[in-house]
Amino acid sequence: MSGIELTNYEKLMLKRRKRRKKRIKSFVIILLVLIVTAVGIFVYLSANKKPKKLNAETLDPPDYVSVQLIDKGKARTGVKLIEINNIVIHYVGNPGSTAQNNRDYFNKHDTDVCSHFVVGLDGEVIQCVPLDEKSAASNNRNLDTISVEVCHPYDDGKFNEATYNSLVTLTAWLCDNSGLKAKDVIRHYDITGKECPKYFVDNESAWEEFLAAVKAELKNY
């Protein structure tokens, strides 16, 4: 049986369909190549992306700070800070305890909490964690904050004069060192609603006075 002979029009249409299929195939191949290339570039850039520089001018504290870094463990994990967006003020919640008492507690192998600094009853300041590492004090804000625990003589959580003055000085330095302002200083309470630091939560005006003192101290930098 002889085959069916195509008309010239049908031959023309068949050629056009074949050319269209070739163009579509070429387009798909080019598109796939572009996608693979884009993915490859993204992966390369991600792998070679420089880590964000921590916004701290120096990791070295002032001379009045006693550096007594706690050992790495549950409390000090060694995880690096992403950046510094706030300074968080806490109170130790253990009336009459000293800065050294609290630092040594942080250093126990089974302790899973710590702060960067502890301000003591005599105005002494101890650094427990490096400024480029996260502490374990401010819940979901540990990765972008510096934490300061503050000692207090009585249950009301009010800081004595020596402690208060050192806290103002340290907080102002931390702000200046990290490019922050007094408004960037917050309470643990502002993160979780916890009554910490107690006196500054119970007395909002005292908290505002503290921020004003930090702002005034910043003028010295």
Sequence positions of predicted segments:
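Short coil-to-beta-strand
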Residues: 139-147
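Short loop/turn motifs at secondary-structure junctions
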Residues: 83, 144, 179-181
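Basic/polar, cationic surfaces and motifs that engage anionic cell-wall
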Residues: 25-26, 30, 46-62, 66, ...
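Soluble periplasmic/extracytoplasmic beta-strand elements of cell-envelope proteins
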Residues: 88, 118, 147-149, 186
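Solvent-exposed, acidic/flexible segments
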Residues: 82, 110, 141, 156-164
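N-terminal catalytic cores of peptidoglycan-degrading enzymes
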Residues: 2-138
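Short, small-residue-rich loop/turn micro-motifs
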Residues: 93, 150, 189
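Substrate-binding clefts and substrate-entry loops adjacent to catalytic sites
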Residues: 132-134, 147-159
